């Protein structure tokens, strides 16, 4: 559909084959301009003008002035404790850190390792359900939304949520209140790095869906995202990942959309691990399961290979990778009242070291 995209990915009319070298000289030049001129090399000048021109040609609504006025925000991370681990993770407008804090602090009240698999999975799913409910209701861009972050990440609040979980019965999602309490991949990439001096990086970047918007601005090599789908375009209507959205994540000029990115670093007295993943709304639960794996004594390879399960409040069902759950576990979970959907495809792509 888009000339610039065809020139990069369909140079001879066909997509590149495995083993073929994909050369992107326009993107290389754009990166050189950024290296030389910093932010001005991207948001302003010839690259910014080319981005705006290609978007305008296709009927897009943002202006060159809006792109030039974009600024990066640096925010304090979410930090909390879990069973001897100090966890550092992403703050809003990523929802990942708040949801991760809630889930781990709920689960920290139980000895999961001592439980049979169905009982352990049940509790993990119920923690996911409650965290994603709060994600939907409260979280958004902190420049626009007054969020009760101190409450949502408070161990006492997690204890209150834990008390609402029945040990052997699922909580129907539609019975969890959808009203706020009073205030107090698939085209995502993650890399986790530790160097010889102990410097650590956990970084996630995304264009949202496969190939983002599909538009490469001619002459730049830049593939533009379709992150607008991460906004709640209509309260109560799910996005492409099935995630519900409320007013806190509604579209507003200059607002950053809520994401699920969860780059995290965890440290104990003698260990450190870095985690993150692609996967849309499943990112948060992938990182959760990874941290639970490290806490259970697994190494990085074992953690990365863990089968994945996921629950996001709505739709009210457990998603599972093929063979992630034993048949007897599925049977018991269904007896507890859980809907279980075992898919045909894997989605786990946790990057950890």
Listing of model-derived features with the role each one plays in the protein:
Residues 1-38, 42-44, 49-91, 95, ...:
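Noncatalytic scaffold domains of N-terminal-nucleophile
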Residues 13, 110-207, 216-220, 235-236, ...:
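Internal maturation/activation junctions in enzymes
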Residues 37-44, 49, 54-55, 105-106, ...:
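Alpha-helical support elements that line or immediately flank enzyme active sites
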Residues 50-52, 116-129, 300-310:
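Short, well-structured alpha-helical segments that form the helix of a local strand-helix-strand
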Residues 61-63, 199-268, 289, 296, ...:
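Active-site rim segments in enzyme catalytic domains, especially the processed small/beta chain
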Residues 74, 185-188, 210, 259-261:
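Short, small/polar residue-rich loop motifs at catalytic or cofactor-binding pockets
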Residues 88-97, 192, 204-215, 277-284:
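Glycine-rich phosphate/pyrophosphate-binding beta-alpha loops
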Residues 255, 287, 295-345:
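Extended C-terminal subregions enriched in glycine
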